[in-house]
């Protein structure tokens, strides 16, 4: 078997990626989230496939088809809630994965990092179109509000929105194409994941010390496969607790009301994992400015390799930047909270302060702290 896995054209690719892969001996549990994201993607594709077998992408039957899945299909309720809460677990792992990349300076592997950001954006797009499919109140109004943002683009905005809608409002054509997008995007994500891994295995993994680990590497299997299995066990336990005991805790009660274009919900808001970006969008009074800020809130991650001027790799020995990093995390939590609040004083003001702080930390404070720490090293 040893010879076969090293020489077989297909098996040797798997061997070099998951078995004999030289891995730093000191990577911590923060490195588990890559494999957990792979697990989440597999769960989402499988549960999604079974849901698609019973779902109908028609405005008159979409809502009742989801109810039919929960009531009449064997374990349909479980598949539906695993899929809905699986998306939340996916984003929790995604945020931690990106946060670890920032903390330990993984963004210096720029190709891997940039493909990762494209993956992040594609996952957000997939989650957005997926949220529209149950055709509840929040699905319909969320789709209307977010797609309407494109009308802020000068000259072509209105035409673009109508083109995406497939008519003059969010209707049957919109739902059908959103279902098509939601079905195809996970497979595009899978392709990007392979490219992400390809670039990662070209350079090798980063490690907590930030030092070159070529002199101290161990095979991925069995050391990290067993570690990943433990992580997967924790993830599945958390997902099952969510799906079985608190299936609706992260959802919106408005989505249990069928979509009605004549009745607007009191507070239109996306799923919890988009709230930070939604808060940044709402904090700017100008429509086009808000859309640009929304885009930049994610695309600014691409600037990390360019903004990094530190002589040290990662934040493990950099207390000033560490403090700024944790302020950034706290700031993102504040933005997430604000995104779910109504548009009124004092929430609007807190949102504006938190949005300015978010961009200031990344564009000003972090590069300044890098320079200060570089000068301290010289002392």
Curated annotation (Swiss-Prot):
Its main location: mitochondrion. The keyword Disulfide bond does not apply. A ubiquinone binds at residue 201. It is found in: Mitochondrion inner membrane. GO terms for molecular function: metal ion binding; ubiquinol-cytochrome-c reductase activity. The chain crosses the membrane at residues 33-53, 77-98, 113-133, 178-198, 226-246, 288-308, 320-340, 347-367. Heme 1 (or BL or b562) is low-potential and absorbs at about 562 nm, and heme 2 (or BH or b566) is high-potential and absorbs at about 566 nm. Component of the ubiquinol-cytochrome c reductase complex (complex III or cytochrome b-c1 complex) that is part of the mitochondrial respiratory chain. The b-c1 complex mediates electron transfer from ubiquinol to cytochrome c. Contributes to the generation of a proton gradient across the mitochondrial membrane that is then used for ATP synthesis. This is Cytochrome b. It comes from Akodon toba (Chaco grass mouse). The lineage of its organism: Eukaryota, Metazoa, Chordata, Craniata, Vertebrata.
């Amino acid at each position: 078997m040893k010879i076969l896995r090293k020489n077989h054209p297909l098996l040797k690719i798997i061997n070099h990626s998951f078995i004999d892969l030289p891995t730093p001996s000191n990577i911590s549990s923060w490195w588990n989230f890559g494999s957990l994201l792979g697990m989440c993607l597999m769960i989402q594709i499988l549960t999604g496939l079974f849901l698609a077998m019973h779902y109908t992408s028609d405005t008159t039957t979409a809502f009742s088809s989801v109810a039919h899945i929960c009531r009449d299909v064997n374990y349909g309720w479980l598949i539906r809630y695993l899929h809905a809460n699986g998306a939340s677990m996916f984003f929790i792992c995604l945020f931690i994965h990106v946060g670890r990349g920032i903390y330990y300076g993984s963004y210096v592997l720029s190709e891997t990092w940039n493909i990762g950001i494209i993956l992040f954006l594609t996952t957000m797009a997939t989650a957005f179109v997926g949220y529209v499919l149950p055709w509840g109140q929040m699905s319909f109004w969320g789709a209307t509000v977010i797609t309407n943002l494109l009308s802020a683009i000068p000259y072509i905005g209105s035409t673009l929105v109508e083109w995406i809608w497939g008519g003059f409002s969010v209707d049957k054509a919109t739902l059908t194409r959103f279902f098509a997008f939601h079905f195809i995007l996970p497979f595009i994500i899978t392709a990007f994941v392979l490219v992400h891994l390809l670039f990662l295995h070209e350079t090798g993994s980063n490690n907590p010390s930030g030092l070159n680990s070529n002199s101290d590497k161990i095979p991925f299997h069995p050391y990290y496969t067993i570690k990943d299995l433990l992580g997967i066990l924790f993830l599945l336990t958390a997902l099952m607790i969510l799906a079985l005991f608190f299936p609706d805790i992260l959802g919106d009660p408005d989505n249990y009301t069928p979509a009605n274009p004549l009745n607007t919900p009191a507070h239109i808001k996306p799923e919890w994992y988009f709230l930070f970006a939604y808060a940044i969008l709402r904090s700017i009074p100008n429509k086009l400015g808000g859309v640009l800020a929304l885009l930049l809130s994610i695309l600014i991650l691409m600037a990390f390799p360019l903004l990094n001027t530190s002589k040290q790799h990662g934040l493990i020995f950099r207390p000033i930047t560490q403090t700024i990093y944790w302020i950034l995390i706290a700031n993102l939590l504040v933005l997430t909270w604000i995104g779910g609040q109504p548009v009124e004083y004092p929430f609007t003001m807190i949102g504006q302060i938190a949005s300015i702080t978010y961009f200031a930390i990344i564009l000003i404070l972090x590069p300044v702290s890098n320079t200060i720490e570089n000068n301290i090293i010289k002392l």
